[in-house]
Regions:
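Surface-exposed, low-hydrophobicity beta-strand/loop segments enriched in small/polar/acidic residues
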Residues: 1-223
Length: 223
């Protein structure tokens, strides 16, 4: 995750603050973090509690001659409740489809994602497989009109038929909570669709040119 701005103004990094952390805790800069027992830890992949913010520095948990804070007792966190942050849009690969459907590869979308979970999400064709006959141009934006849990079928307006291996970026509906559609990745640095999660994040913007989505916390530790 990359802190972008505070919605209520002020520099993101200038408003970052020190919080206690166990010396051995491993957190990467950009990770979504929370408080546990008064100390900073990684947010859970399917976090249901309040989020503190985004780690502003690396804390490797081991001694580092070039970074005396690497295993220190403090870590800086961008903690403004109005913090806007961004990450790369998650991607899926098509396994099959038609002029009006896209079926992601097995495992690219969690099988537990509910019916309609991706309705009104926007897909952007990022890459075509070598043998793809897809007639859509790279960069084509496709609105998902319906999502069926059975078969993980995404319905769309008539257009190019996806080839197996075609790659699409997925942009969740603006204003929608990510929970139930995606969860935080292993290091809490981005969003994955492979696992359904109750992440306390809300999508508030799309940046199609840079392939990024903008997010805010739904529940915050300081409010």
């Amino acid at each position: 995750m990359h802190p972008v701005q505070n919605a209520d103004g002020g520099s993101v990094l200038q408003t970052a603050r020190n919080y206690p952390i166990d010396a051995a805790t491993v957190i990467d800069a950009g990770a979504v973090v929370k408080l546990s027992g008064g100390k900073v830890v990684l947010a859970a992949a399917a976090e249901t509690g309040a989020i503190l913010g985004i780690a502003a520095e690396f804390h490797s948990g081991t001694e580092d001659a070039l970074n005396l804070r690497a295993n220190g007792k403090w870590i800086r966190v961008c903690d403004n409740p109005t913090l806007i942050f961004e990450c790369a849009a998650p991607t899926i690969k098509a396994a099959s489809g038609s002029a009006t459907t896209i079926v992601p590869e097995t495992g690219d979308v969690d099988a537990a994602a509910a019916d309609d979970a991706f309705n009104n999400a926007v897909l952007v064709l990022k890459e075509k497989a070598a043998n793809s006959g897809n007639t859509d141009a790279l960069g084509t934006q496709i609105v998902v009109t319906d999502y069926a849990k059975t078969g993980t079928v995404m319905t769309k307006a008539s257009g190019g038929a996806p080839g197996a291996g075609d790659v699409y970026e997925v942009y969740p509906v603006i204003g929608a909570a990510i929970g139930g559609v995606a969860s935080l990745g292993d290091k809490r640095l981005g969003i994955t669709l492979k696992t359904v999660g109750a992440t306390k994040l809300r999508c508030i913007g799309h940046d199609y040119e840079r392939g990024a989505i903008k997010l805010m916390a739904i529940g915050h530790a300081l409010t």
